[in-house]
């Protein structure tokens, strides 16, 4: 793969087995079928489609959460998925979620402490930081998830409808940060 390419899809498909109405056999459903594309480092790309067209399936494949069933997706760099209600444990507090995400990604306790203040400042959720995430509004969850992933400094940011919730002020703050990331040569994918 060319070193200027952030993501390359080669005949990638994601297939789900659906039980037929008669429950006698499974039917193959292609959520994604034979995708071929390249996204260059530093590009900002928007992926559009109707409900059920496979956009969120693509986002979890691009993020490395699951693999395509056919073909391959090659990712050149670290990636972070920012999606509504994704990656947060509802039983834990916001602060505990910051620590958990860092630990799951293999960050040292020192590195987690270094990024914690940046997450807290960017998220602007005040005392809710010490409450279980299950008490958060969808906008607050989006703020926390976005802020955690932002402070991890990934090469590739995959934003799956995460900016569609919450207030206009925070969305503008996020878009300004995305502009900064683009200027740093980061790859950004909006879904």
Indicate where each model-derived feature is located.
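ABC nucleotide-binding domain "signature motif"
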Residues: 69-78
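Helix-to-loop junction immediately C-terminal to a conserved catalytic motif
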Residues: 63
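Conserved ABC ATPase "signature" region
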Residues: 99, 111-128, 147
């Amino acid at each position: 793969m060319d070193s200027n390419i952030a993501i390359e899809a080669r005949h990638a498909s994601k297939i789900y087995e659906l039980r037929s109405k008669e429950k006698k056999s499974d039917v193959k459903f292609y959520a994604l079928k034979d995708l071929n594309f390249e996204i260059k480092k530093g590009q900002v790309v928007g992926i559009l489609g109707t409900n059920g067209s496979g956009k969120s399936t693509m986002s979890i494949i691009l993020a490395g959460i699951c693999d395509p069933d056919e073909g391959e997706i090659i990712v050149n760099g670290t990636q972070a998925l920012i999606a509504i209600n994704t990656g947060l444990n509802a039983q834990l507090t916001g602060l505990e979620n910051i620590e958990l995400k860092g630990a799951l990604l293999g960050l040292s306790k020192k590195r987690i402490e270094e990024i914690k203040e940046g997450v807290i400042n960017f998220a602007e959720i005040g005392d809710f930081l010490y409450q279980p995430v299950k008490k958060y509004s969808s906008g607050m969850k989006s703020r926390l998830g976005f802020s955690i992933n932002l402070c991890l400094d990934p090469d590739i940011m995959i934003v799956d409808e995460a900016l569609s919730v919450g207030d206009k002020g925070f969305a503008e703050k996020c878009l300004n940060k995305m502009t900064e990331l683009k200027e740093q040569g980061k790859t950004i994918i909006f879904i």
